[in-house]
Amino acid sequence: MSKILVFGHQNPDTDAIASSYAFDYLSQKAFGLDTEVVALGTPNEETAFALDYFGVEAPRVVESAKAQGSEQVILTDHNEFQQSIADIREVEVYGVVDHHRVANFETANPLYMRVEPVGSASSIVYRMFKENGIEVPKAIAGMLLSGLISDTLLLKSPTTHVSDHLVAEELAELAEVNLEDYGMALLKAGTNLASKSEVELIGIDAKTFELNGNAVRVAQVNTVDIAEVLERQEAIEAAIKDAMAAEGYSDFVLMITDIVNSNSEILAIGANMDKVEAAFNFTLDNNHAFLAGAVSRKKQVVPQLTESFGA
C-alpha cells in the first residue's frame, strides 16, 4: 500500500506547511495511517524562520502524487482543485482539513472532511490533537502557532475566531515562546521583500479563483512600508502581465498589506477592472487604490470579488 501524501496548497504559506506537518504526525499517531508530509513549493522566508526556530526540516517538494507512487492524498489549508497538486483529479482525496470556502471540489468516494470558519487550518489540527488525546510535541506546537500567527497577523485579522485566542495561548505555552515577541519576529521575517525579484514577489502567496468563468489570481505580500513596494510598480506590473499571458489569468489582484497599520494597497490589472472597483467601492488610479483596514484575502477580498463577478 502506497503512502498517503499530506500537503497544503501551491505557493505554500506558513499555515499550509504547519498544518500539513502536524496533521501528518497526528494521522500516524491517532489514526494509524501510513502518511508522508510533502509540499507543493519551497517555504517562504517567514515559514523558513519558523522551521529554523523550532528545528523542523522542510518537507520535500513534489509536483505529482502518482509520480511518488501515491494514489491517495490529504489536503490541508485548501480544497479547491486549482490550488492543489497537479494530478489531483487522478488520485483519491482521502481527507481535507481546511478553513476556506469550499469550491471547485468534488470526489468520487466518501472522505473525511473538516472545514471550520476559524483563523487557520493549524487551529483545527491543534483541536484534533486534543480531541484524540495526543500530546503535542514542542516543535509541532511551535509550527501550529506559527501557522495561526501568520494567517491572522498575530490575531489582528478579521478572520480571527474567538477560539483562536485560547489556541494561541495554549500553543505558545507548549512551544515555550512569548506570543507577542515570537509573533512579531515571525511576521517581520516575512516582510523582507528587497531580495525578491518581481516574479518571486507576486508568487510568494498567490491563489487562483474561478469566478464566473474567469481565472482570477489574487496574491498578497506583507510589508512594513507600502510605498517601498510601489516604487517597483512598473516592474511588478510587467511580471504580472507575463504571468497572465503564460497562465491565462483574466485578472490579477495584488494585495500589498501593511502589517503594522493593518491596511492594504490593491494593485490590479486585467479584463474586469470595473468589477474589481465595484467590489471594493473604490476607483483605481494608475492601477492601484488604498483599501483601509483590509488585511485578509479570505474575508476582505475574495468574497467581495466573488459577489462582484457574479460567481
From Swiss-Prot:
Compartment annotation: Cytoplasm
Enzyme Commission code(s) on record: 3.6.1.1
Catalytic activity: diphosphate + H2O = 2 phosphate + H(+)
Pfam families per the UniProt record, alphabetical: DHH, DHHA2
Keyword annotations of the record: Cytoplasm, Hydrolase, Manganese, Metal-binding
CC cofactor note: Binds 2 manganese ions per subunit.
GO molecular function, one term: inorganic diphosphate phosphatase activity
GO CC annotation, single: cytoplasm
Family: Belongs to the PPase class C family.
Record protein name field: Probable manganese-dependent inorganic pyrophosphatase
Gene: ppaC
